[in-house]
């Protein structure tokens, strides 16, 4: 179905016909490619399957797509690499604010197989120096946001600390007056989805500045 929010051209949501939770796995990649084979002029992606870095609804498997080219799709590969056993697949790190791997090739089965290898490797990856932990206290942190365009894999980590209880790799508290909601698939690809409250707050802020009012005296403006 087409989204009522229409964040971009022909913004659509594809639902799993069976009520099942969000889960990033090999079958996810198969579904993505099945869709873009039917609709080659569309992209299709899946939000991650963990809190904070995932979508707002994790209880039902779904995808988002559309007839639109996001900034991430235009971003170049800054470093190419080859995965052993997949020399026939082009792979590279995308020049993007998030950790993005782009893989491409003519054989979708090979792309699916490599995506599954990358997912499995990332699920268990830990780099303490970079504060990346596969899991802490039994809670898993690593997942990916896959996007197919006839493919980018965005590496995500949802670890939290006392200093950043909503996520280390999430907007920090000093930015929550702008946005504290999940950073999902659409934002990952370069389109900012800001909360509706900002529209009224920005107009209120404009009037307060023009009037020379004390911003700290107004609760809705003091954080700005």
Residues covered by each model-derived region:
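HIT superfamily nucleotide-processing domains
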Residues: 1-224
């Amino acid at each position: 179905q087409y989204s009522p929010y229409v964040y971009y051209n022909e913004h659509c949501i594809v639902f799993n016909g069976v009520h099942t939770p969000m889960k990033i796995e090999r079958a996810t990649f198969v579904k993505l490619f099945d869709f873009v084979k039917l609709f080659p002029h569309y992209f299709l992606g899946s939000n991650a399957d963990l809190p904070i870095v995932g979508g707002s609804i994790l209880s039902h498997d779904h995808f988002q797509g559309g007839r639109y080219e996001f900034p991430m799709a235009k971003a170049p590969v800054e470093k190419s690499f080859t995965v052993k056993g997949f020399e026939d697949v082009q792979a590279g790190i995308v020049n993007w604010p998030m950790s993005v791997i782009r893989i491409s090739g003519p054989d979708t089965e090979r792309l699916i197989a490599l995506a599954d290898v990358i997912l499995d490797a990332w699920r268990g990856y830990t780099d303490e120096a970079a504060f990346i932990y596969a899991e802490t206290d039994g809670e898993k942190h690593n997942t990916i946001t896959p996007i197919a365009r006839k493919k980018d894999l965005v590496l995500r980590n949802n670890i939290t600390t006392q200093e950043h209880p909503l996520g280390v790799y999430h907007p920090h508290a000093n930015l929550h007056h702008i946005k504290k909601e999940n950073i999902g698939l659409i934002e990952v690809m370069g389109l900012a989805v800001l909360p509706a409250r900002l529209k009224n707050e920005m107009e209120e802020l404009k009037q307060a500045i023009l009037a020379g009012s004390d911003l700290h005296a107004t609760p809705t403006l003091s954080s700005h």
